[in-house]
Amino acid sequence: MSCSYLLSGDASVVASRRWSDVSSRQRLFLPRQSLRQPSGSSFSRCVRLVANVNDHFSKQSLATRNCLASVFSADLGGSNGNNDNGNGGGGGGDGGGDNSDDSSFDLRYLCFLLLGLSCFFHFRLSAASAIAKDQNSDSNGDAVKETVWEVRGSKRKRLVPDFVKDEFVSEESAFELSSSLTPENLLAQCRNLLTQFLLPEGFPNSVTSDYLDYSLWRGVQGIASQISGVLATQSLLYAVGLGKGAIPTAAAINWVLKDGIGYLSKIMLSKYGRHFDVHPKGWRLFADLLENAAFGMEMLTPVFPQFFVMIGAAAGAGRSAAALIQAATRSCFNAGFASQRNFAEVIAKGEAQGMVSKSVGILLGIVVANCIGTSTSLALAAFGVVTTIHMYTNLKSYQCIQLRTLNPYRASLVFSEYLISGQAPLIKEVNDEEPLFPTVRFSNMKSPEKLQDFVLSSEAKAAAADIEERLQLGSKLSDVIHNKEEAIALFDLYRNEGYILTEHKGRFCVMLKESSTPQDMLRSLFQVNYLYWLEKNAGIEPASTYSDCKPGGRLHISLDYVRREFEHAKEDSESVGWVTEGLIARPLPTRIRLGHDRELLLSSPNSS
């Protein structure tokens, strides 16, 4: 019997027989597809198993799969033979018709049985591997289900997995171009564009939390300032003779004289730059008041055209001084906003914000100026409204600023609270309590809601205000020391310090050595706070300077406490965000030099 015979017309005839009725040679050449499919549940389970491990089993050879199917068919066929024979000897009862093939059949059957067992165990291993891989893919799928964002500054882009290319792709690429032109997307793109041009890169993580509120208020005040500027410029032009047939050369000379005299104020005011570092909020508010006063004077020039140069020069001086103070204090604010030391970025975006507000203000100012015309009364009324808005927004913007440096008032408030409660206060708590000018008590304009908050102790606030008034940095040695014993006692006590502290006529006099640093001034202020605490809480009143320098004296006790606790106070303050690199102060220029001339100084007639 040839193979071609079995694979052609008679294959269906042979395949229709029972497996026990087919000879061993026919079994070898009978195609796997022509076998009668069993109906047992074991075969169904086998099919499901094959489907589950398809990726593993597909790598096996065709011969292995054919043998496996033959084994299952033989096994199930034998079972059918047993069922058909009833009480007979099973499938082998009828299969013994061909005695010449019995021995070869038994050997092949044994081989098929062993091969089937091998394939069975292979199936079990493949199934276990497939289950493990499926569980692993499930766990990976859970991880993929977690949202992944690509962040660039304030712009976020959601990434989704592409399982075909095995990579992450932007979610935006899944949408059509038409879907990106929706009003929501256009609004988002405009917002991203404004953020890119007007806010520092990495916002809000690249700046401090008070930056946005300050910028918003500053934008409104910038608009109001430009409106006032347009109205003032219009008044100046009317005063100089615009539209009244004035000689252009005379008008130009008056204008140049006005600006030239005004520039002198900026040069003279530059020597007081250290004042602006100590109280930048108060000086900035003063600069805004000065600027508005200058605008008001310029608007009065049409009423008094004969005093144009005088009034214009005074107004120009005020505007120049205000511009200098604004530029100086703006640097202090920008340095505080740059939480990642991105000073140039913050300054550049601040200038961009200023240009936007100025452009809007100029447009609104032109509209208001056209509505007012030449009426001075209407111009003054509009100026009053705009100035009120300008000053209110300025005040709100400065209240938003959280200064992290330590000037004498803030340092005294921090140290006093530390001595009372054992903890350094938060930055916001101290800035909310600090008045714009500590020496001017009414300058601390707090809202009624904030007046109800008593976060800091009243003792600490009273101590900070009192120390601010009584402190004198850079005192003269000749004004404090009156005899040789006091000088020797102070020099010996503060031998290893960069300053000399004593109390004289109710004032805390700090004499700075030539090598003293801002850190030494901060250290001296910590000792001043402890001296004040000893005076108010321990009842230790000041005695003579010589007695206070002895062991057990006020100066000796306070200096010993400073040497033990100053570093702890610094660390506690730094932990809440304070910059403790040094004291921001304006000391007097006098310094003390100690060295080879010390004996000569102490033995001089002036010291006795």
Swiss-Prot record:
PANTHER family: PROTEIN ROOT UVB SENSITIVE 1, CHLOROPLASTIC (PTHR12770:SF22), RUS1 FAMILY PROTEIN C16ORF58 (PTHR12770). It is found in: Plastid, Chloroplast membrane. The gene is RUS1. Interacts (via the DUF647 domain) with RUS2 (via the DUF647 domain). It holds the Pfam family UVB_sens_prot. This is Protein root UVB sensitive 1, chloroplastic. Disruption phenotype: No visible phenotype under normal growth conditions. Extremely stunted growth, failure to develop true postembryonic leaves and arrested primary root elongation, when grown in vitro. Several mutations in ASP2 (AC P46645), but not all, and any of the non-phosphorylated B6 vitamers can suppress the rus phenotype. It comes from the Eukaryota. Residues 1-68 form a transit peptide. InterPro entries: RUS_fam, UVB_sens_C, UVB_sens_RUS_dom. Expressed in cotyledons, roots, hypocotyls, leaf veins, root vascular tissues and root tips. Expressed near the root apical meristem, in the cortex region of the root elongation zone, in lateral roots and emerging lateral roots. Not detected in extreme root apical meristem or root cap.
